A protein has these predicted regions:
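Short coil/turn segments that connect the beta-strands within blades of beta-propeller domains
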Residues: 66-67, 116-118, 164-165, 205-207, ...
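C-terminal substrate/ligand-recognition segments
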Residues: 109-122, 133, 438-466, 474-547, ...
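Short loop/turn segments that connect beta-strands within beta-propeller blades
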Residues: 132-135, 180-183, 227-230, 318-320, ...
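Short, conserved, GDST-rich strand-edge loop motifs in beta-rich repeat architectures
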Residues: 210-221, 279-307, 355-369, 459-485, ...
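Blade-level signature of beta-propeller repeat domains, shared across WD40, Kelch, NHL, RCC1
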Residues: 558-603
């Protein structure tokens, strides 16, 4: 077990732009990791914080208390925009650390949830902790003994879910586990299959809905709904179109049973008014076209649809799993450019500005108001669709346009997408630079409804790829975009979803894999690989506050309130992308295994 509590409070620096202030030791608690054994649940004999627990209802999930954070992005629409405003542009300079809790070594890509003053969080090793959200005190811990250790190679679950009096944990060994929210005892568990649960879950109308990686072959690639009370399977939607499915022809194969495309990333979103579930799907596998299509790069289409339902937005009936519509963002992917992660469900007027937006649907009336599903791809495109029917509204390369950009065109009237054929691997040993590579990934965006803006962390990364050939070993490496400014490798973008206009701020060299968070206090929070956790003005991007933590910020960022006091929580630690990101800035010497929870509040 690592030992990191000795870093001491003076190592945690706070600044309001340039004025540093160190929190006195009496204002914070540094708490050690827990020590239970796999397969056990340990509960505190006295948990006064649990006395206020109330079961979570469907109405609470639809309209959560400002005090709670009940799912990975707080609300079904993935806004990550809190109505709390005690911490605001005037008071944020006084923000201090309230408590810290160390976690054990391992992978942490998770986002805590909070209900009635209790924080539930996935800890490294595939554990679930319940803590007093005001001070980090232990309530209970569940440590899973993996039943399928062969597939539980990385405990990468992104989020827990909560409903009634149960917390739902999609464990790395392919099980969905329902835990008693008060005690941590197992209420039920159900095996999804030989797939790794990397995504997390949301609960919609009494169903626990989750995705994950694929196991072996197309039958292992699906989104599943399980009854929240019993764990009984309700439905599955297979993300590789099977024979008999209208999308099967897009594979141009008699047998695609060994092809795969998963939902490994962030969970789906839900429009309660329309009763529609939206999910993003990752790239097809194997990663390149020749490997999937018997050595023929033209074995599938150059325009959408190709290899369905890879790189798609899916609109599903949450009660049955039936497909309502799909939109394919990139056909027949050749470069592992996932279009998974959250779809932001906003309502905006259609007024894209050609200065900022490359592809605009010319048939849509200017000023018309649309309920949209917006997404930012790992491969670097912002898409805005009408979520009623999947109609294409606008899209643009992100963070910049580039000759090595993987998309060559979009038919703006139909929304049909076309990949960049010049960058497709056509012969063994081919080598290409492709843009972009993980310009964002499983760290969520945030949408500030008051100014119609999506806040997105970006990395100006491309990839140098080579496939195997005679005397040539396959390989790839991440590189800055050719011609880019090395001192502006990373940053944050404020993207207006009505106009497409962008404001870039916090430009620098430190890659970020922390979640975005906006608040009614006029703030946007974000952290990066430099150990800096910052608050900015949501309108201007001006930095208002900064804390220097013990390690790189990892996903996680949330805010909540208990007894009238607002808290901001962030986690540091190791996750899948940390070695790759750290390699880009080796001179930073970022501590990559500093797994901890940090919580801040006003004095």
């Amino acid at each position: 077990m690592k030992r990191i509590s000795a870093f001491a409070l003076p190592a945690i620096l706070f600044s309001a732009v340039i004025v540093a202030a160190v929190a006195p030791r009496s204002e914070a608690q540094i708490l050690p990791p827990l020590a239970t054994q796999p397969g056990q649940t340990v509960t505190s004999p006295q948990s006064p914080a649990m006395k206020n627990f109330t079961p979570v209802t469907d109405e609470m999930l639809r309209n959560p208390s400002p005090n709670d954070w009940l799912m990975y992005s707080r609300t079904y629409d993935a806004f990550r925009d809190s109505p709390l405003n005690q911490i605001n542009t005037k008071t944020v300079k006084n923000l201090r650390m309230a408590w810290v809790r160390d976690l054990e070594d391992g992978v942490t890509e998770t986002i805590p949830i909070v209900h009635d003053g209790i924080m539930y969080v996935i800890a490294p090793g595939g554990y679930v902790d319940a803590l007093d959200a005001t001070n980090g005190d232990f309530i209970w811990e569940y440590r899973r003994a993996f039943k399928n250790p062969g597939i539980a190679t990385n405990e990468r679950t992104k989020a827990l879910a909560i409903y009634k009096d149960m917390v739902y944990f999609t464990a790395a060994d392919g099980y969905v586990v329902a835990l008693d929210a008060r005690t941590g005892k197992v209420r039920w568990e159900t095996l999804k299959g030989e797939t790794q649960n990397t995504s997390g879950a949301i609960v919609v109308d009494g169903n626990v809905i989750s995705g994950g990686t694929c196991g072996k072959g197309s039958d292992s690639c699906f989104i599943e709904a399980d009854n929240a009370d019993t764990g009984e399977r309700v439905w599955r939607f297979f993300t590789v179109a099977h024979p008999g499915d209208p999308g099967f022809a897009s594979w141009n194969q008699d047998d695609n049973s060994q092809s795969m495309t998963s939902t490994w990333g962030l969970p789906g979103t839900f429009d309660a008014k329309r009763d529609v579930l939206y999910y993003g799907v990752a790239n097809p596998m194997p990663d390149n076209r020749m490997a999937r299509h018997n050595g023929n790069p033209d074995g599938t289409g150059r325009v959408s649809p190709a290899d369905l339902y890879s790189n798609c937005t899916l609109a599903l009936d949450p009660k049955t799993g039936k497909l309502i519509w799909y939109y394919q963002h990139l056909p027949g992917d050749d470069w592992d450019t996932d279009h998974t992660h959250e779809r932001t469900l906003a309502r905006v007027a259609f007024n894209p500005n050609p200065k900022y937006v490359k592809w605009i649907n010319s048939t849509v009336p200017r000023g018309s108001v649309h309920d949209i599903a917006a997404m930012v791809a790992e491969g670097g495109t912002i898409f805005v669709l009408d979520r009623n029917n999947g109609q294409f509204l606008w899209a643009t390369p992100f963070p910049y346009d580039d000759p090595n950009y993987i998309m060559s065109d979009i038919d703006v009237k139909t929304g049909q997408t076309k990949l960049n054929w010049d960058l497709v691997f056509k012969q063994p040993g081919d080598r290409h630079i492709t843009c972009y590579w993980n310009t964002r990934s499983y760290w969520p965006t945030a949408y500030h409804e008051a100014n119609e803006s999506l806040f997105v962390p970006f990395i100006d990364n491309c990839r140098d790829n080579q496939i195997a050939g005679p005397g040539v070993k396959p390989g790839w490496k991440v590189i800055p975009r050719p011609g880019s400014d090395p001192n502006k490798l990373t940053g944050l973008a404020k993207v207006n979803l009505s106009t497409g206009e962008q404001l870039r701020f916090d430009l620098g060299r430190a890659p970020g894999n922390g979640a975005m968070l906006t608040t009614a206090g006029g703030l946007v929070f974000h952290g990066d690989m430099s150990r800096r956790f910052r608050a900015f003005d949501v309108n201007t991007g001006e930095k208002l506050w900064e804390a220097i933590l013990g390690g790189n910020i990892s996903v996680s960022t949330i805010t909540y309130a208990v007894n009238g006091k607002q808290y901001v929580c962030v986690m540091t630690g190791f996750n899948l992308k940390v070695p790759e990101l750290a390699a880009e800035v080796p001179d930073m010497h970022t501590p990559t295994n500093h797994n901890s929870i940090y919580v801040f509040a006003l004095p």
